[in-house]
Amino acid sequence: MLSSTFVRTKAGRSKPVRLTAVIAAALFLAGCPSQAPQTPPANIQDEASASSDYYLQQLQQSSNDNKADWQLLAIRALLREGKLPQASEQLNQLPKNLSSVQQVESQLLTAELQVANKSYVSARSTLGHIDSGSLSANQLVRFYQAQIAVNQGKASLPLIRAYIAQEPLLTGKAHQNNLDQTWQSLLQLTPQDMNSLVINANENVLQGWLDLLRVYQDNKQDPDLLKAGIKDWQNRYPQNPAAKTLPTQLNQVLHFTQASTSKIALLLPLNGQAKVFADAIQKGFEAAKNGVTPSTPVQQQQPASVPEQAAQPASTDPNANGAVSTSAPDAAPVTAAQPSAPSTAPITPPQAANAQIKVYDTSSQPLAALLTQAQQDGATLVVGPLLKENVDQLASSTTTLNVLALNQPETPKDNPNICYFALSPEDEARDAARHIWEQQKRQPLLLIPRGAFGDRVAKAFNQEWQKLGGQTVLQQGIGSASELRQMVNSGGIRMSGTPISTAPAPQAVTIAGLTIPAPPSDTPATSGGSVDSVYIVATQSQLTLIKPMIDMATNSRSKPAMYASSRSYQAGAGPDFRLEMEGLQFSDIPLLAGANPQLLQQASSQFRNDYSLVRLYAMGMDAWTLSNHFAEMRQLPGFQVSGTTGVLTAAPGCVINRKLPWLQYRQGTVVPVS
């Protein structure tokens, strides 16, 4: 018989407690299994949110049956963490006897690794061997994201189909992003792309998206018609995911409101070296306000004939003041062939001729004080400032006024009330990059002035080239005309250069919501290679020496296509020069390319044939047009205006892009590039 023990209570009495129950409880607890936390089983078809260290540790501790699963999860984590060499090593060490589920995951990881390494051709091939029907929902998201990544943002039917297939698998912000990216891809389709599309009869969602794009393209120049068109489309395609949740940009269209231009504050430097440029802009602004448009004749106020060599006013390079880019002073215009009509019809500005305009002098007061004064004066829109140092201050401004700046900072910030319109060499270089790319050239060489001016041009060209999908851009600095003459006697120009070092860093890749950092670049760029195109930023006197040297340095088979900026286009060039330039293409604003000869005649006479000031006069005209379409530029993606300085569209951040006409010297004449 078990003995009893006595426990003394607070009251002082002893209470017997049987040991039987205590011992029984102890024996029961001793027999219970351990309650230590259990490692959840590896599920390669689900999320893999833990660190690679955790999965690698489980790999070491697991039995042979689970090792491959943990290894696959570790590879996925290594990819997410940007540890691409380690991921590749683990992928190569996978056992050969994988199950069918493991083999599919291995293929998907291989494709994701190839995407991360930018081996897009290999990734596309790997993805083509994966049966999407065998994938889980989580794997499908990754599968379609990899398909999207291999297209590198280039609009195509496979890219759009991948977005559409991915959409039902997403929720919340990821779902909205999917709709926005689908829409952006559709907007990138060219008319040629649209005409060549072949879709299946059962692709109802794709058909709905394409019809929405047609509605947008047909009505984007009229906000009211566009609103009605979108609502009608929603009624016709009620089951389309975009009908239930519009892309962000189209949702903004439904809430579009026109901006007031009843009182405009024009901020310009009225004193100092930049005054001559400000005067030209102001005259163009007022001319457009009074009814002069790029496409309508003007009343001649000057003699019809212009002396071939008029005296030139002393003109300071506006770039020195951070203003705008122009070419050197020019002589009388040559007769150029009429360029082909732009695809965008000219926009008639709203009836704002009665708008009140007040000019404020940025050379006399700080920008912040002028903005405050303009607001107190009742201004509803600000046009300007012009000088770059003033434009740089806009980012820190607290003004709520709509501002059309006449220049742009190095890195424009996206402010909801600011647009940037610059007649800059960088803007022209970006247009040149797009033009050369459209002509199927892929290995450009830039011949640019040495120094800060040339560096800015090279950086702008290269950044646009990378956006288009281009690779290395070479640059070579050029000196004065006298230096170039010496080069003629010492072997001429070499068709090589140094890679531009301002290329953007490799971008990270996002797969299934996980951002994989870009791998470090360890491939040295080359300075030679086959150059197929040359973009020349030079004066006419420099170009007279450069082109013949290129012709002599290359044979007819390897001769690169040659392009020049407006800097080289000066009026009054004789037939010998035009014959020497045979085949060379160059860009300039529509006004100087022959879009309105009567307006050009008047402007040239007014500024004594100084094309630098004629360009600024044209800029002032377009500033008036943009002022009257400020809200459209800010809120309607794809909205276009055909102006005197180019076809104007708004890029992200409301940076106004200009598409310029391109001309070519052919048999002693100047004709549009076909």
Swiss-Prot record:
Lipid linkage positions (S-diacylglycerol cysteine): C32
Record-given protein name: Penicillin-binding protein activator LpoA
Biased amino acid composition, Low complexity: 292-315, 331-349
Record keyword Lipid metabolism present: no
CC annotations in GO: periplasmic side of cell outer membrane
One function term, GO molecular function aspect: enzyme regulator activity
Lipid attachment in record (N-palmitoyl cysteine): C32
Compartmental location: Cell outer membrane
Organism placement in taxonomy: Bacteria, Pseudomonadati, Pseudomonadota, Gammaproteobacteria, Enterobacterales
Membrane topology: Lipid-anchor
Organism: Serratia proteamaculans (strain 568)
PANTHER family: PENICILLIN-BINDING PROTEIN ACTIVATOR LPOA (PTHR38038:SF1)
Function: Regulator of peptidoglycan synthesis that is essential for the function of penicillin-binding protein 1A (PBP1a).
Signal peptide segment: 1-31
Biased composition range(s): Polar residues: 316-328
The keyword Zinc-finger appears for this protein: no
Keyword annotations of the record: Cell outer membrane, Cell shape, Lipoprotein, Membrane, Palmitate, Peptidoglycan synthesis, Signal
SUPFAM superfamilies per the UniProt record, alphabetical: Periplasmic binding protein-like I
Ranges for region Disordered: 291-349
Similarity remark: Belongs to the LpoA family.
